[in-house]
């Protein structure tokens, strides 16, 4: 199921003298079956944008269409249950939301909340824990005894246990060490392979390159570009300065080499790609 934002505007305190406009005239489609990265400088509206995906926020004007569900400003809270069953949200530092006595009990909470019988909730929780590579020996431990990376995976399992079609991740790799980041990106790839639509916010462009099929760029509350990683990261340097974004590491190195006289046919996205281009350049000298 694709997600369509149609003429979406959002203001905190809408209709008051203290209204604070955040999102402006958002018209964008998040394609089904892909991993979409939302990027942009701090304060560009990314978190506000994704909170419209499961009705934590509702458009001040316009609408968000997810399959047959239409989110508008006048939708009642009681009508959001079906949307939230379809759209799972994992917030930044989700381990702060862990609360139960054991890992398994924590992950069972969401499916029970959505009406699963206890036995079904336990099966769903165990399936989700396996999906994010949390070993069985940890299931009966307190989640607060785990490492940061393990806690992050348990929190993700809590969202996956109710089997949503859409997974939304706010800075999923924030605060993790390199090993934890690598494991997290592997989980994102696995979610796509399982047929999920994945949306994630990231400030790390190399993570975007590693897993995203589709990229949405936000700046000052609006969508200023969208496309494949190749399309986005081959825009000119002036544009990147305008939207206050960095290039991936390979792109940064490539620009430094260009300034030193190297001729590269395009801006590489991966360091391995850059190495190949330099080897080709050397062979033609």
From Swiss-Prot:
<dbReference type="Pfam" id="PF00005">
    <property type="entry name" value="ABC_tran"/>
</dbReference>
<dbReference type="InterPro" id="IPR027417">
    <property type="entry name" value="P-loop_NTPase"/>
</dbReference>
<keyword id="KW-0472">Membrane</keyword>
<dbReference type="InterPro" id="IPR017871">
    <property type="entry name" value="ABC_transporter-like_CS"/>
</dbReference>
<dbReference type="InterPro" id="IPR030946">
    <property type="entry name" value="EcfA2"/>
</dbReference>
<dbReference type="InterPro" id="IPR003593">
    <property type="entry name" value="AAA+_ATPase"/>
</dbReference>
<dbReference type="InterPro" id="IPR050095">
    <property type="entry name" value="ECF_ABC_transporter_ATP-bd"/>
</dbReference>
<dbReference type="GO" id="GO:0005524">
    <property type="term" value="F:ATP binding"/>
</dbReference>
<feature type="binding site">
    <location>
        <begin position="40"/>
        <end position="47"/>
    </location>
    <ligand>
        <name>ATP</name>
    </ligand>
</feature>
<dbReference type="GO" id="GO:0043190">
    <property type="term" value="C:ATP-binding cassette (ABC) transporter complex"/>
</dbReference>
<keyword id="KW-0813">Transport</keyword>
<dbReference type="InterPro" id="IPR003439">
    <property type="entry name" value="ABC_transporter-like_ATP-bd"/>
</dbReference>
<feature type="domain" description="ABC transporter">
    <location>
        <begin position="3"/>
        <end position="245"/>
    </location>
</feature>
<protein>
    <recommendedName>
        <fullName>Energy-coupling factor transporter ATP-binding protein EcfA2</fullName>
        <ecNumber>7.-.-.-</ecNumber>
    </recommendedName>
</protein>
<keyword id="KW-1003">Cell membrane</keyword>
<keyword id="KW-0067">ATP-binding</keyword>
<keyword id="KW-0547">Nucleotide-binding</keyword>
<comment type="similarity">
    <text>Belongs to the ABC transporter superfamily. Energy-coupling factor EcfA family.</text>
</comment>
<dbReference type="GO" id="GO:0042626">
    <property type="term" value="F:ATPase-coupled transmembrane transporter activity"/>
</dbReference>
<feature type="active site" description="Proton acceptor">
    <location>
        <position position="171"/>
    </location>
</feature>
<comment type="function">
    <text>ATP-binding (A) component of a common energy-coupling factor (ECF) ABC-transporter complex. Unlike classic ABC transporters this ECF transporter provides the energy necessary to transport a number of different substrates including 5-formyltetrahydrofolate, pantothenate and riboflavin. Expression of the complex plus FolT in E.coli allows 5-formyltetrahydrofolate uptake; 5-formyltetrahydrofolate is not taken up in the absence of FolT or the EcfA1A2T complex.</text>
</comment>
<comment type="subunit">
    <text>Forms a stable energy-coupling factor (ECF) transporter complex probably composed of 2 membrane-embedded substrate-binding proteins (S component), 2 ATP-binding proteins (A component) and 2 transmembrane proteins (T component). This complex interacts with a number of substrate-specific components, including FolT, PanT and RibU for 5-formyltetrahydrofolate, pantothenate and riboflavin respectively.</text>
</comment>
<dbReference type="InterPro" id="IPR015856">
    <property type="entry name" value="ABC_transpr_CbiO/EcfA_su"/>
</dbReference>
<keyword id="KW-1278">Translocase</keyword>
<dbReference type="GO" id="GO:0016887">
    <property type="term" value="F:ATP hydrolysis activity"/>
</dbReference>
């Amino acid at each position: 199921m694709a997600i369509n934002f149609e003429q979406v505007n959002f203001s905190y305190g809408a209709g008051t003298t203290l209204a604070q406009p955040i999102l402006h005239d958002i018209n964008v489609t998040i394609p089904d079956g892909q991993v979409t990265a939302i990027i942009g400088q701090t304060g560009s509206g990314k978190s506000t944008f994704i909170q419209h995906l499961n009705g934590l926020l509702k458009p001040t004007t316009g609408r968000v269409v997810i399959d047959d569900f239409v989110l508008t400003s006048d939708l009642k809270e009681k009508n959001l249950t079906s949307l939230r069953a379809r759209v799972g949200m994992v917030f930044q530092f989700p381990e702060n939301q862990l609360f139960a006595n054991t890992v398994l009990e924590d992950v069972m909470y969401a499916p029970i909340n959505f009406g699963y019988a206890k036995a079904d909730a336990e099966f769903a929780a165990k399936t989700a824990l396996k999906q994010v590579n949390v070993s069985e020996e940890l299931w009966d431990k307190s989640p607060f005894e785990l490492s940061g990376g393990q806690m992050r995976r348990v929190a993700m399992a809590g969202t996956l246990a109710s089997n949503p079609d859409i997974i939304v991740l706010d800075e999923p790799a924030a605060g993790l060490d390199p090993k934890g980041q690598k494991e997290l990106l592997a989980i994102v790839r696995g979610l796509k392979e399982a047929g999920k639509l994945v949306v994630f916010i990231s400030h790390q462009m190399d993570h975007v390159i590693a897993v995203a099929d589709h990229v949405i760029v936000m700046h000052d509350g609006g969508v200023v570009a969208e496309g494949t990683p190749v399309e986005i990261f081959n825009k000119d340097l002036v544009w990147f300065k305008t939207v206050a974004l960095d290039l991936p590491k390979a792109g940064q190195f490539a620009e430094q080499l260009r300034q030193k006289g190297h001729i590269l046919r395009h801006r590489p996205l991966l360091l391995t790609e850059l190495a190949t281009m330099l080897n080709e350049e050397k062979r033609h000298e």
